[in-house]
Curated annotation (Swiss-Prot):
Functional note: Catalyzes the isomerization between 2-isopropylmalate and 3-isopropylmalate, via the formation of 2-isopropylmaleate.
GO CC terms in record: 3-isopropylmalate dehydratase complex
Subunit structure, as described in the record: Heterodimer of LeuC and LeuD.
Family (UniProt): Belongs to the LeuD family. LeuD type 1 subfamily.
Enzyme class: lyase
Keyword Amino-acid biosynthesis attached: yes
Protein's UniProt name: 3-isopropylmalate dehydratase small subunit
PANTHER family listed in its UniProt record: 3-ISOPROPYLMALATE DEHYDRATASE SMALL SUBUNIT (PTHR43345:SF5), 3-ISOPROPYLMALATE DEHYDRATASE SMALL SUBUNIT 2-RELATED-RELATED (PTHR43345)
Top-level taxon of the source organism: Bacteria
Length: 204
């Protein structure tokens, strides 16, 4: 998992509430357990004019140009703005996989579904909670936003906002540690335990 550093990006304003995981990545694309390759089907039913299936050549599919992800001014955006209860529905981890594979590094919303919120951290995405009044301000922005995880701050052209985050989750994002990476930090301790254990119980 890549280390999360301070970055600046435009933000995509997807002004919808209660976006569930099936809207984020439809169920027909969940057959793979690899983390990569889901970005092209992110928000598939809104992004394309036809019905998507596994194996289709997405470059030849008709785009819905009214959908924000397809608009030229938002290409390359790393920040997603949404309304409340983002990531509700089934607890598929493919949803943050698709968001991360598309290129999103942070999602800002008034609230998130609990399991989705936890899965974001495990996949290197920073979910930021801001109240509705602040979200109203963000949705009117036309410039770039800078996110500084170390300072827990969001900077626009005119204002600075702050957000809360669990200190351990913050540490893991800053250091690029997923569950496996966190475990590997204790490799020497694990080897020492295994050696001691098998010396004591060598008949096992």
């Amino acid at each position: 998992m890549q280390k999360f550093t301070t970055f600046t990006s435009i933000a995509i304003p997807l002004e919808r509430a209660n976006i569930d995981t099936d809207a984020i990545i439809p169920k027909q694309f969940l057959k793979s357990i690899k983390r990569s390759g889901f970005g092209v089907n992110l928000f598939d039913e809104w992004r394309y004019l036809d019905h998507g299936e596994v194996g289709m050549d997405n470059s030849k599919r008709p785009l819905n140009m009214d959908f924000v992800l397809n608009q030229a001014k938002y290409q390359g955006a790393k920040i997603l703005l949404v309304r409340e209860n983002f990531g509700c529905g089934s607890s598929r981890e493919h949803a943050p996989w698709a968001l991360e594979d598309y290129g999103f590094k942070a999602i800002i919303a008034p609230s998130f579904a609990d399991i989705f919120y936890n899965n974001c951290f495990k996949n290197g995405i920073l979910p930021i909670v801001q109240d509705n009044n602040i979200m109203d301000e963000f949705f009117t922005l036309s410039g770039e936003i800078m996110i500084n995880l170390d300072a827990q701050s969001i900077h626009t052209n005119s204002k600075t906002y702050f957000f809360e985050i669990d200190i351990e989750r913050k540490r893991r994002l800053i250091n690029g540690l997923d569950d496996i990476g966190l475990t590997l930090q204790y490799t020497d301790d694990i080897k020492a335990f295994e050696k001691d254990y098998f010396n004591k119980y060598n008949w096992l």
